[in-house]
């Protein structure tokens, strides 16, 4: 049957899908828009499944902290391309995810990704045409202290910090420092032994160590390991907004100590497959024939 342009327009407005996809759905249902929507919803699950094997290494992070600093949550939601990561619909989905995490104090993705979140995700995959996934979620509760957060302007780096005391603004300043400098641990004593041992091996292999007496090598080793620990321990680092004081001193002057921090950066740890243009076109042609 012939489908009117107004009906196609209505379906597009209600689903956000493309004109040809909407027209096809209406033709298949003889113009029944409700059945067309139902069929499209069913199809979205299949479409989402087909895209699930594609690497989603772009995206954004989001963070939300209680006004009193009693707790905060942070999430990472991935897309395949940076272009989609700036899409209004994608960003609205991220807001839904972080608000759900905040309201429920979610501690893992499985607990967060209920029917509502999953159905919204699948509908977005259907509309945008990319694999989209909620990768991780982090909850930090302040206890008797305070939690602060920082989200970088590009939405690709976010940090939650926990202090024993102080206020949300101090915790936020320290979170901003963590975002900028990326320390490995809070205190040097927290550095994993295997990391220290690996650094020692690197130092021993440096040319200026060759041929020196053992006692000299040992002294140089101690000095360089201490330097490495200071450079990578949050409380020993010069505060990014005032290098005259360390982060530890900044917190101490406010009657606080840094308990911990968590830093999310979009795509860290994900191996992104790089394809050349010819390979990408070939893959798309093969997919269209499947």
Swiss-Prot record:
* UniProt keyword Protein biosynthesis, yes or no: yes
Please list the coiled coil stretches: none
The domain of life for this entry's organism is Bacteria
Q: Which keywords does this chain's UniProt record carry?
A: Cytoplasm, Elongation factor, Protein biosynthesis
State what this protein does: Associates with the EF-Tu.GDP complex and induces the exchange of GDP to GTP. It remains bound to the aminoacyl-tRNA.EF-Tu.GTP complex up to the GTP hydrolysis stage on the ribosome.
| Similarity-based family | Belongs to the EF-Ts family.
Under which name does UniProt file this protein? Elongation factor Ts
Q: What is the lineage of its organism?
A: Bacteria, Pseudomonadati, Pseudomonadota, Gammaproteobacteria, Cellvibrionales
């Amino acid at each position: 049957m012939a489908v009117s342009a107004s009906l196609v327009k209505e379906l597009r407005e209600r689903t956000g899908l493309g004109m040809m996809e909407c027209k096809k759905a209406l033709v298949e249902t003889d113009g029944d828009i409700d059945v067309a929507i139902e069929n499209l919803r069913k199809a979205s699950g299949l479409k989402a499944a087909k895209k699930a094997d594609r690497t989603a290494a772009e995206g954004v992070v989001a963070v939300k902290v209680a006004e009193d600093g009693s707790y905060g949550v942070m999430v990472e939601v991935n897309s395949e391309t940076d272009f989609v990561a700036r899409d209004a619909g994608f960003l609205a989905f991220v807001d839904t995810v972080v608000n759900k995490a905040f309201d429920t104090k979610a501690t893992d993705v499985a607990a967060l990704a209920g029917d509502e979140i999953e159905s919204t995700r699948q509908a977005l995959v259907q509309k945008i045409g990319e694999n989209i996934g909620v990768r991780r979620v982090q909850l930090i509760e302040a206890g008797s202290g305070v939690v602060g957060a920082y989200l970088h302007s590009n939405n690709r780096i976010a940090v939650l910090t926990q202090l024993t005391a102080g206020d949300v603004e101090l915790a936020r300043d320290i979170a901003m420092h963590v975002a900028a400098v990326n320390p490995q641990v809070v205190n040097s004593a927290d550095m994993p032994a295997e990391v220290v041992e690996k650094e020692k091996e690197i130092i021993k292999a440096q040319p200026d160590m060759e041929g020196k007496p053992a006692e000299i090598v040992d002294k140089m080793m101690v000095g360089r390991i201490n330097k490495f620990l200071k450079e990578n321990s949050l409380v020993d680092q010069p505060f990014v907004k005032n290098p005259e004081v360390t982060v530890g001193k900044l917190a101490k002057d406010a009657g606080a100590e840094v308990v911990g921090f968590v830093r999310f950066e979009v795509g860290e740890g994900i191996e992104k497959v790089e394809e050349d243009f010819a390979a990408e076109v070939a893959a798309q042609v093969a997919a269209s024939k499947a």
